[in-house]
């Protein structure tokens, strides 16, 4: 299992996704230039399914993401194209994950002219695909989008700013419900602040309902991740204090001790497989921020807080 898959098991993510989420229609007209088509792949990770978006008002339309490759999505796309007499001329993929890219072969069946047209774009393109450059502009009648490089959820993640609306297609960087998995926390936080600086009002996410207050949602994501950092720092302080009372002058904690302090006692395979990658990432970010440090002992990193014990971090 890769790090991306592991990340979906983290407590923040699963706790948020466990809450009830609203039903979404398979096809929904969100604005005069945006139609959402569900990917037909509902699940714990995908929520109601992957959102794919048809943009534009003319005979040629732009598509953001292609779902996971489900037959139902192909049927919906073919039906919409026939009914409204349009074709997809450009496909923009937010990132490499299969639930966003798996429908590309289905598009070739619906729109055979796409094959060989150099019209499929991704940050790290597959053979026969084209690269996306940060700031690159794509347009069709009625819709103009600008690519915004937002790594963190994945190394290649792109969001797309819709210039005709105060809106942004967020992919998996910000979801309509709950929070997302993160591969690189430091990059993710930078991407959130980059999105926030754009001042968008509406978010069209890769999963879940439309985000009606984008600025508020992004701030909630920033706050959530910062709370987790504070929790780790507080746990380190407590462990250091406890160890020093029993004569351990260094008082540093292993990653495993931190996981147990924060999440409770877990089966070893669960802690190692699901929580260890998350804890490693957050500790490395905090080390770069000089909030924590580590020393090697017995071949392991032992972590300590770089703050005064007389000034403990608030919960």
From Swiss-Prot:
Endocrocin is specifically produced in conidia. Endocrocin and related anthraquinones compounds have interesting activities for medicinal uses, including anti-inflammatory activity. GO terms for molecular function: hydrolase activity; metal ion binding. The keyword Transcription does not apply. Zn(2+) 1 binds at residues 95, 97. It is an enzyme of class 3 (hydrolase). Induction: Expression is positively regulated by the transcription factors brlA and laeA. Its EC number is 3.1.2.-. Zn(2+) 2 binds at residues 99-100. Keywords: Hydrolase, Metal-binding, Zinc. Coiled coil: none annotated. Pfam families: Lactamase_B. One of its GO terms (biological process) is endocrocin biosynthetic process. It comes from the Eukaryota. Disruption phenotype: Abolishes the production of endocrocin. It catalyses: atrochrysone carboxyl-[ACP] + H2O = atrochrysone carboxylate + holo-[ACP] + H(+). Its cofactor is Zn(2+). Binds 2 Zn(2+) ions per subunit. InterPro entries: LACTB2-like_MBL-fold, Metallo-B-lactamas, RibonucZ/Hydroxyglut_hydro, Sec-metab_biosynth-thioest, WH-like_DNA-bd_sf. Atrochrysone carboxyl ACP thioesterase; part of the gene cluster that mediates the biosynthesis of endocrocin, a simple anthraquinone interesting for many biotechnological applications. The pathway begins with the synthesis of atrochrysone thioester by the polyketide synthase (PKS) encA. The atrochrysone carboxyl ACP thioesterase encB then breaks the thioester bond and releases the atrochrysone carboxylic acid from encA. The atrochrysone carboxylic acid is then converted to endocrocin anthrone which is further oxidized into endocrocin by the anthrone oxygenase encC. Belongs to the metallo-beta-lactamase superfamily. This is Atrochrysone carboxyl ACP thioesterase. The gene is encB.
């Amino acid at each position: 299992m890769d790090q991306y898959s592991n990340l979906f098991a983290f407590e923040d993510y699963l706790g948020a996704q466990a809450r009830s989420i609203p039903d979404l229609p398979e096809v929904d007209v969100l604005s005069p230039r945006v139609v959402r088509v569900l990917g037909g792949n509902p699940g714990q990770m995908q929520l109601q399914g992957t959102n794919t978006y048809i943009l534009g008002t003319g005979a040629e339309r732009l598509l953001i993401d292609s779902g996971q490759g489900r037959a139902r999505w192909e049927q919906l796309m073919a039906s919409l194209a026939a009914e409204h007499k349009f074709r997809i001329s450009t496909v923009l993929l937010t990132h490499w994950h299969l639930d966003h890219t798996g429908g590309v072969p289905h598009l070739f069946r619906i729109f055979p002219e796409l094959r060989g047209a150099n019209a499929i774009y991704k940050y790290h393109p597959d053979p026969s695909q084209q690269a996306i450059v940060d700031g690159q502009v794509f347009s069709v009648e009625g819709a103009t989008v600008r690519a915004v490089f937002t790594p963190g959820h994945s190394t290649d993640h792109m969001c797309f700013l819709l210039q005709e609306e105060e809106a942004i297609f967020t992919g998996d960087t910000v979801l309509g419900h709950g929070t997302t998995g993160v591969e690189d926390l430091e990059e993710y936080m930078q991407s959130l602040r980059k999105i926030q600086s754009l001042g968008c009002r509406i978010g069209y996410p890769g999963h879940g309902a439309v985000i009606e207050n984008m600025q508020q949602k992004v701030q909630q994501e920033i706050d959530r991740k910062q709370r987790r950092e504070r929790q780790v720092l507080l746990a380190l302080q407590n462990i250091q204090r406890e160890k020093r009372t029993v004569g351990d002058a260094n008082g540093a904690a292993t990653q495993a001790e931190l996981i147990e302090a924060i999440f409770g006692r877990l089966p070893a395979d669960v802690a190692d497989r699901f929580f260890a990658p998350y804890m490693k990432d957050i500790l490395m970010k905090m080390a770069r921020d000089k909030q924590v440090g580590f020393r090697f002992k017995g071949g392991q990193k032992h972590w300590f807080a770089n703050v005064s014990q007389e000034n403990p971090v608030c919960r």
